[in-house]
């Protein structure tokens, strides 16, 4: 699996809350930073020759199932992004299970406040594409490093208040930064 389970800010927030660990404590052993499409983003650490998720127990079962990342919640579904939105797709060759039953995506993904979750997922995806465009257009290594670390620090490492709604906090941070990004792009 390698670094294929890329984490978004909600995933890291859920892991931090569920495991009662700070983001820095998670980065010290359970998650790692890696480059994904030019962006430096956290992903679940994999171990051993088989590159197994650190959260799989000895029986191969997920030990963080109730607060597992969105990528894990989605599998074997995927998302196809187009025109500022996305559609769910079924990756039929990814799942070994042969007896499949119909289930609503909302139930499968099993996340509270599904409408806000889908908005967040879409907004985060397109924000990263905007960041990626800046990274690919620049040859300034300092700008590339600083922009990547800015995203990591502002959206992952900066603590979210566990007593407040995640989405409210995310959009308070992202709105400010997205507006600054748009202003800079128009200069």
Model-derived features with residue positions:
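Conserved small/polar residues in nucleotide/adenosyl-binding loops
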Residues: 176-185
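Terminal transmembrane helix and immediately flanking juxtamembrane interfaces
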Residues: 155-164
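Nucleic-acid 5′ end/cap handling module spanning
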Residues: 170
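Hydrophobic scaffolds flanking metal-cofactor catalytic centers in soluble metalloenzymes
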Residues: 1-134, 158-159
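Long, charge-rich alpha-helical interaction segments
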Residues: 143-151
